[in-house]
Amino acid sequence: MQPSHQSVIKVEQLSKTYGKGENAVMAIKACSFEIFKGETVALLGPSGSGKTTLITMIGCITEPTQGKLYLDGELIFDQHWRISDTRKLRRQKIGFIFQSHNLIPFLNVEENITLVPLMNKTNPKEATLKAKELLDYLGVGNKLTAMPSQLSGGQSQRVAIARSLANNPKIILADEPTAALDGERALSVMQLLKKLATEQDVAILVVTHDERMIPLFDRIIRVNDGFVTEDIQQMS
C-alpha cells in the first residue's frame, strides 16, 4: 500500500521561541511541511537542530509561538487560538514511542498497553483483546503478563510500539526509537515501523540521527538551526 494523499499533519510557518527580550532563543523558525496517511518520514538533523522541539509541538506537548498546526485536517493551533483539550487529542489521535521505552515499571505489559484505551473509555475486554492482537503481530505474544523488568531491550521496544498503536492513532511520533539498540536490532525495529505504516495505514514520523536508516523512509526532512533545510521524497 502506497502513502495516500490524506493529510494527517500539516504545519504552516511554525515557530517556537523560548524566553523573552534579549534572552529569547528561536528554536524553530517558520517550518512548513505536510505528512500523509501511511507515510514514513525521518526527521534528521544534528544535536540541537530543533528536531525534538518540532516533534513535541506536533505531539501537542509544547505550544508553538507562531504559525498553524493541523492534525487530521483539524486546526489545533494558530497564534490567536488553540484547541482546549490537548491531552484528550493526544490520547485519541497520537501514538508515542520514546528512546527509553517509558514503560511504567509497576504495571505489566497488558496494563501498559491498555492504559490509554481505558482512559478513552474503551471496553476493558476490547482493550485486552487489542493488546493481545498487537503483541502477537509484533512477535511478543507470550509477554502479556510480563513485567517491564523481565523484558530485553528489543522486547521492551516492541511493547512500546504496541502501546503506541493501542488507541488506533492517526500518527505515531517516535523520538530516537533505536538509539539504545545495537545495529541489527535497530534495523529490525525500523523495518517493523515501515511495515506498520503500510499494514496499519498510519503515518509515522521518526526523529533520528542515524543516516543508515535513510533508505527505509518514504521521505527525509532535514532540520538545521531551527529551519527545514531539505524535504526529499524518496523513490520506492
What residue ranges belong to the model's regions?
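ABC-family P-loop ATPase nucleotide-binding domain
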Residues: 1-17, 230-236
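ABC family nucleotide-binding domain
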Residues: 8-9, 14-223
